[in-house]
Amino acid sequence: MDVMKYNDLRDFLTLLEQQGELKRITLPVDPHLEITEIADRTLRAGGPALLFENPKGYSMPVLCNLFGTPKRVAMGMGQEDVSALREVGKLLAFLKEPEPPKGFRDLFDKLPQFKQVLNMPTKRLRGAPCQQKIVSGDDVDLHRIPIMTCWPGDAAPLITWGLTVTRRPHKERQNLGIYRQQLIGKNKLIMRWLSHRGGALDYQEWCAAHPGERFPVSVALGADPATILGAVTPVPDTLSEYAFAGLLRGTKTEVVKCISNDLEVPASAEIVLEGYIEQGETAPEGPYGDHTGYYNEVDSFPVFTVTHITQREDAIYHSTYTGRPPDEPAVLGVALNEVFVPILQKQFPEIVDFYLPPEGCSYRLAVVTIKKQYAGHAKRVMMGVWSFLRQFMYTKFVIVCDDDVNARDWNDVIWAITTRMDPARDTVLVENTPIDYLDFASPVSGLGSKMGLDATNKWPGETQREWGRPIKKDPDVVAHIDAIWDELAIFNNGKSA
């Protein structure tokens, strides 16, 4: 797995600029709604990452649309193009369930994977670029950061790409997660993490082990792309996101201890927010326009109090927006789809392809094609998708087709559904399952149903009827017509010879 080298976000931006993948905007643009409008138009056109050098009212530039194309996501993961992300998935599958070499030849084949593992340990620094400037106490003022307001109905400016660092009591490994954070004061943000996410679980354990004590939290803004992407990739529970970022980058992730707590943050981050959550302190969060294309409900989440802001000289603020696909999360989903395939195939070798259509909000609907081997096989695969990776916990619909269907072609998939399914026999409904809190269509917040569609050819035991045979053309006739096609001149507005 060849790795595209860069050390930090600034290195990566230089790389993008050299390849025509970064546009500097010198015209003053307002972080209130205007940057979103420009970024949205650019993303939909497949355009470059955008660096707004003069956001109105601020001296700090804003980076947007960084992961606006699958190619840039692949570059962030150290690869030349999206197809190479299958190799990242194979590496993750190997790390999830490593197998000892079966012999010398197998050892030689696995050698590149073992060499990459050498980049997993973090490198701890005494001082770091992210601590070149330090502000604390009453001098902390989040309003100096050009935090974007993305949609007209949004409650307040919103931090979107904050890499939140937490740790459970008596644990060495840290958790990295991306959670949006609503600005509610000069030193206060609302930490919107769902109850099953790593940060929330760390907080729950802390509260149980240390009643009444403040929970330390740090948030890195403008971390290097490998570290950001490591936080949204299905990394095995035994592997830290920093370690995985080192694998992607090809160099050890450099970290530094925070000024006010023992958490370790990316040494090259542009900005770091340090602080705590006071147990029991919550605030109503939202509404905000979300990746579903709707404003979400208002709900209460913990308040993050910022005690220190550390940053690099001439720091860059990295931001994005979320809305009805396509948006950056949808583009990330398209790229990460390629990472998921080898992981699923290692557990279920019968899977030929797996596809999360971006118009399905990146994860709410999945299409799986399989080499069917027995009656009921499709139902086993449905259950496997829902249970194997936590990323698919909220997938509402799973469609399973045979391997003669292209999972990424709706014409093929709809044909399979309408010709190979009996709705009563081939539909699986599972009630009272975990559902995305943002899914207002579910009857209860966080709890709803799932549907599996078995659009495979039916085997004996699944049907008593003679099954239809697909129409296939005569290859000799096809070859003959190919040979005389130009002479027919059907589309040339002329006469055949």
UniProtKB/Swiss-Prot annotation:
Residues in coiled coil: none
Cofactor note: Binds 1 prenylated FMN per subunit.
Enzyme nomenclature, EC number: 4.1.1.98
GO cellular component terms listed in the entry, alphabetical order: cytosol; plasma membrane
Gene Ontology terms: biological process: ubiquinone biosynthetic process
A GO molecular-function descriptor: metal ion binding
Localization annotation: Cell membrane
One Pfam family matching this protein: UbiD
Residues the entry annotates as binding Mn(2+): N175, E241
Source organism, top-level taxon: Bacteria
Pathway the protein contributes to: Cofactor biosynthesis; ubiquinone biosynthesis
InterPro entries named in the record: UbiD, UbiD-like_C, UbiD-like_N, UbiD_bacteria, UbiD_Rift_dom
Family to which this protein belongs: Belongs to the UbiD family.
Role: Catalyzes the decarboxylation of 3-octaprenyl-4-hydroxy benzoate to 2-octaprenylphenol, an intermediate step in ubiquinone biosynthesis.
Cited NCBIfam families: PRK10922.1, UbiD family decarboxylase
Protein's UniProt name: 3-octaprenyl-4-hydroxybenzoate carboxy-lyase
Organism: Shigella dysenteriae serotype 1 (strain Sd197)
